[in-house]
Regions:
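Central hydrophobic cores of alpha-helical transmembrane segments in multi-pass inner-membrane proteins
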Residues: 3-17, 29-44, 81-95, 111-112, ...
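Cytoplasmic/organellar membrane-interface segments at the starts of transmembrane helices
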Residues: 8, 364-366, 419-503
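Hydrophobic alpha-helical membrane-insertion segments
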Residues: 30-45, 161-173, 413, 451-464
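Hydrophobic alpha-helical transmembrane segments
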Residues: 68-84, 197-215, 406-412, 492-497, ...
Length: 503
């Protein structure tokens, strides 16, 4: 079943070359919808209780090196798989009907397969393969369908992410060799790695190697410079997929690999990572406030929110870690809605400059309402999806360091300011004469945006729909950190951070 979810979009993408251009959007949306229904089927029918991973499937690929096709999921993987499937469907459904869409739709389906592989792989060589393969379709989407400087943006994106991944590959090979030294056989099986005792000094170097790969993808300061440029040049569908899922590959890597594999290093360097995250939050918020382009505001807002996610992850406790994963889902939904909205107004007005608008609420009331809902979620208003993840992430980091929580909370206030100022400048005041003829949202656009708005409200009111299923898997990560730590002080600190914690 899991292998079907991983490879169904890729196989369908290959078959898509046989489909006529006029039918390709319907074909792609149908494939993405089937993929989403398969993911929901797993949510409803698979019991995750009492298991580290379910739906595991293993086939030996290179026996001499013990490399295998080994996949399996827990609820952390599952929520990201559902998010990937949902946003792939929304992205294709929201495409304009004009132009040659065949290669764009095929690229999205290939990208969806690689994302499913990243969130399911339990063999590290397999994980690395899916990780690197995800670069190819997104590189093509930006380079072939982006704006004027799309080639430069695509190359910059590729160089940053590829070079970061090289460090991870070296670390993967080294840990495989450690297994050979201790047992006489190479192993890239994550479950074997969880049982491997790694000294504290080695953990630090290995943590840093993974940190470069995941930090570039997240992206952490100062590795973030590729992201605003990629967003600025990418087509709307590229920005949606980049913000909703691709960035989560980095934060997922920290949760799945860095914390449980290198618990002593994670605790030792948690302060360092949190300081970087706070710099990232404040810096991105201030830069966002200074932007004149709507899409760039959303891009820097995205960086700021990823910083809050990093604070939650490196709080090293159940509350913060659970909140960070919830915030991954929240950010994926909210940022996607905002990028879709910016893409819609760009199609009509052929500009994203904030100064070119004003008073749009009068001529586009439906557009203004949905943008308002997404803005409220972005600033973390209670009863929206944006509040829960931010609150839990900051509550978690408060247990680690009160100053980090205070600075993180202050930066969120700055974020509220720039988003509200953006909304005021675009939707209130006098409407320019050239914008009086702009058309409000049509049925197709509403069909893509309304589900996102419903999720923003529903999961803000009932966050336990995600939090409760997540709790056992998050607790499992914490337990692995405690049992695998080689330093007794690390065990005690993690235990004290998690005393009596529940999601």
């Amino acid at each position: 079943m899991l292998s079907v979810i991983i490879f169904f979009p890729a196989i369908s993408a290959i078959l898509g070359f046989l489909i006529e251009n006029k039918s390709i959007k319907f074909y792609g949306a149908s494939i993405a919808l089937i993929e989403l229904l398969l993911a929901i089927f797993i949510c409803v029918n698979v019991d995750f209780q009492g298991y580290d991973f379910v739906l595991t499937h293993q086939v030996s690929l290179i026996p001499s090196l013990n490399i295998s096709y080994f996949v399996g999921i827990d609820t952390i993987s599952l929520v990201l798989i559902v998010l990937s499937a949902f946003m792939s469907f929304i992205s294709i459904a929201a495409l304009s009907d004009d132009g040659n869409l065949k290669h764009l739709v095929i690229s999205v389906l290939f990208l969806e397969s690689t994302m499913m592989g990243v969130f399911s792989a339990l063999d590290m060589i397999l994980f690395y393969s899916f990780w690197e393969l995800s670069l190819i379709p997104l590189l093509y989407i930006i380079g072939a369908f982006g704006s004027k400087n799309r080639i430069y943006a695509a190359i910059k994106f590729f160089i940053y992410t590829f070079l970061g991944s090289v460090f991870m590959l070296v670390a993967i090979i080294f840990i495989g060799y450690l297994c050979y030294q201790k047992s006489g056989v190479f192993s890239f099986n994550l479950l074997d790695w969880y049982k491997l005792g790694i000294g504290e000094n080695a953990q630090i170097w290995l943590f840093l190697a993974f940190f470069f790969a995941f930090g570039v993808k997240t992206p952490l300061f100062p590795f973030h410079t590729w992201l605003p440029y990629a967003h600025g040049q990418a087509p709307t569908i590229g920005s949606v997929l980049l913000a909703s899922v691709l960035l989560k590959m980095g934060t997922y890597g920290f949760v799945r690999f860095s914390l449980p594999l290198f618990p002593d290093a994670s605790l030792l360097l948690s302060g360092f990572v949190c300081v970087i995250a706070i710099i990232m939050i404040i810096y991105a918020a201030l830069v966002a406030y200074a932007q004149s382009d709507m899409k760039q505001v959303i891009a820097y807002s995205s960086i700021s929110h990823m910083g809050v996610i990093m604070l939650g992850i490196f709080s090293l406790n159940l509350i913060g870690l659970g909140g960070s994963i919830f915030l991954m889902i929240s950010h994926g939904i909210v940022s996607s809605a905002l990028f879709l909205l910016v893409g819609i107004i760009y199609e009509r007005a052929h500009t994203k400059e904030i100064c070119e608008f004003g008073g749009l609420a009068k001529v586009m009331p439906k557009y203004a309402l949905i943008f308002f809902i997404a803005t409220l979620a972005s600033i973390g208003l209670p009863l929206t999806i944006g509040f829960v993840g931010e609150f839990l992430s900051l509550l978690g980091v408060f247990k680690l360091n009160k100053l980090f929580a205070l600075l993180g909370g202050f930066s969120i206030i700055v974020g509220a300011v720039y988003m509200l100022v953006l909304y005021k400048r675009v939707f209130f005041g006098e409407c320019k004469e050239k914008n009086l003829s702009l058309k409000d949202l049509n049925f197709k656009e509403l069909a893509a945006l309304v589900p996102l708005c419903l999720l923003i409200i529903a999961l803000g009111i009932a966050p336990n729909l995600i939090l409760k299923p997540l709790e056992p898997s998050v607790q499992n990560i914490i337990s692995k950190m405690q049992t695998r730590a080689v330093n007794s002080g690390t065990k005690d600190k993690i235990s004290s951070l998690n005393g009596g914690s529940k999601l």
